Amino acid sequence: MSKQTVALFFGGKSAEHEISIISARSIAAQIDRNRYELSPLYIDRDGKWHASECSQQVLDTDIAALLRSGTPESAGKRLDELTAAAAGECFDFGSFLKNTDVAFIALHGSYGEDGKLQGCLDTFGIPYTGCGLTASALAMDKVLTKLCAMNAGIAVAEFMTITSCAYMANPLETIVEITKRFDWPLFVKPASLGSSVGISKVRNAEELAAALENACGLDSKALVEAAISGREIEVAVLGNSDPLASEPGEIIPGSDFYSYEDKYIKNEAKIVIPADLPEGVAEEVRKAALTVFKALGCEGMARVDFFVENGTNRVILNEINTIPGFTDISMYPMMMAASGIGFAELVEKLLLLALEKRSITHKI
């Protein structure tokens, strides 16, 4: 039987560029080379697609070690060196279309997780892992995700949407409006970034102004959200029409909240899988994860994040990630492993789900 070619997309224009590379390295190590030919496809920070030689060199670079070396800027420097050396290479889009059987998308954040690439691949009839265009776009936007979840009966924290234009036009009025509506502390988040990029916990008006400046500089709108006193619980979901939910996992942050630095540089957070939850709460969280997954029209995979409120055990949606991390410290593969699906099997299932999804859409 001839091997199928898997195009592994990684890198990208988002702030999660390095994390995408780390995820791709983990995925590449688990792809069954007896069944698949791997064709790495690196997208640099400027959005340029690189030919296989440069892409393989980037994939071979241990970005995680560079990030944790104490000089994270060395990761960016190394990537710049590789792409500069490959400046004369020309990506052959025609060959890509002809030879690719299925795409594994390991891009996180904007221009990879938000539906843009999914729409491009749909146009050319290339099946791909994870959610389709619409679900990807909805899930990428934390505000739209909350509205869909509320419509499906899932609790969310009190929130308010601030457009970057409105804030820049009248920052003082925006801050006054927020302070009237919310108690301290609260969270400010870019509406469409992942890996906790740009998130701030604020305790006063001065910190609020700085947090809004930061979030609005990263995205076209910001989400202001009441702080929830509770445990951070996550669930991995896998499947198309009949998805399954994993054992829940718990993150115990090493700081005020599970920040980008906590996740990928300091690595101080404690992870507990399965989460030690009161009787009935674990099943409620799993059911809520499936409800959100279906409400958004997700396919393939997603990680759904919740709070379990202290004192009440109320299950409150935080967010959903349609292309969760696949690093060695990422919750999604670890929760699946705790549910009986190892990393290699998980990668294989995601590729098969992508092909299954394509076979269904081709009948329409």
Curated annotation (Swiss-Prot):
Its main location: cytoplasm. Mg(2+) 1 binds at residues 305, 319. Its EC number is 6.3.2.4. This is D-alanine--D-alanine ligase. It comes from Chlorobaculum tepidum (strain ATCC 49652 / DSM 12025 / NBRC 103806 / TLS) (Chlorobium tepidum). It is found in: Cytoplasm. Binds 2 magnesium or manganese ions per subunit. GO terms for cellular component: cytosol. It comes from the Bacteria. The gene is ddl. HAMAP family: Dala_Dala_lig. Pathway: Cell wall biogenesis; peptidoglycan biosynthesis. Cell wall formation. It holds the Pfam family Dala_Dala_lig_C. It catalyses: 2 D-alanine + ATP = D-alanyl-D-alanine + ADP + phosphate + H(+). Residues 146-352 form the ATP-grasp domain.
